[in-house]
């Protein structure tokens, strides 16, 4: 069976074959290994974003991860990054083996574009029962400018 006839197969093969040489014209537009790894980590980390009157809340599921294993950062003054790594428990007992491994292990990451009215000095993060909640306070709305009155002179 010739798999070349199926365009989806060739697209998938192109995505999986990420070369190391970035000087080549053919490879310049292909995604890098880092991009592919980050995209996979982001897709596997579900999150909700909630807007409150005075703050934004980012709620991220983190089952089985301790709070000290989670890193929350702000990059480029407007990107909230939640990252970390979930490690498999090191239990090596003789004669014990996994029959099925469905829980995702490895690195995780989510990036969120922060709105212009986010107060970067007022960000807090709390992890409780496997759910991380990052709260970003809003900046107060700017005060409306008062109209300037111009004195009309009679000539």
Swiss-Prot record:
Q: Which GO terms describe its cellular component?
A: cytoplasm
Q: Which Gene3D superfamilies match?
A: 2.60.40.790
Boundaries of each sHSP domain copy? 38-155
Induction of synthesis? By heat shock.
Q: Does the keyword Cytoplasm apply?
A: yes
Tree of life domain: Eukaryota
Q: Which Pfam families match?
A: HSP20 (PF00011)
Task: Describe the subunit structure.
Answer: May form oligomeric structures.
Q: Name one GO biological process term.
A: cellular response to hypoxia
**Which compartments does it reside in?**
Cytoplasm
Tell me if Zinc is a UniProt keyword of this record: no
Indicate what this protein is called per its UniProt record.
17.6 kDa class II heat shock protein
Q: What is its main location?
A: cytoplasm
Organism from which the protein derives = Arabidopsis thaliana
Which key words tag this protein in UniProt? Cytoplasm, Stress response
Family classification: Belongs to the small heat shock protein (HSP20) family.
């Amino acid at each position: 069976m010739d798999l070349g006839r199926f365009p989806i197969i060739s697209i998938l093969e192109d995505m999986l074959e990420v070369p190391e040489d970035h000087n080549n014209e053919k490879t310049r537009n292909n995604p890098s290994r880092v991009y592919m790894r980050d995209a996979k980590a982001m897709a596997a980390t579900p999150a909700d974003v909630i807007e409150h009157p005075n703050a934004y809340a980012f709620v991220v599921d983190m089952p089985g991860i301790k709070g000290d294993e989670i890193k929350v950062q702000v990059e480029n003054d407007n990107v909230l990054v939640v990252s970390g790594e979930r490690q498999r428990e090191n239990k090596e007992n003789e004669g014990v083996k996994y029959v099925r491994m469905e829980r995702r292990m490895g690195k995780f990451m989510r990036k969120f574009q922060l709105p212009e009215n986010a107060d970067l000095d007022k960000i807090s993060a709390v992890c409780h029962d496997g759910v991380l909640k990052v709260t970003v306070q809003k900046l107060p709305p700017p005060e409306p400018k008062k109209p300037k009155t111009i004195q009309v002179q009679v000539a």
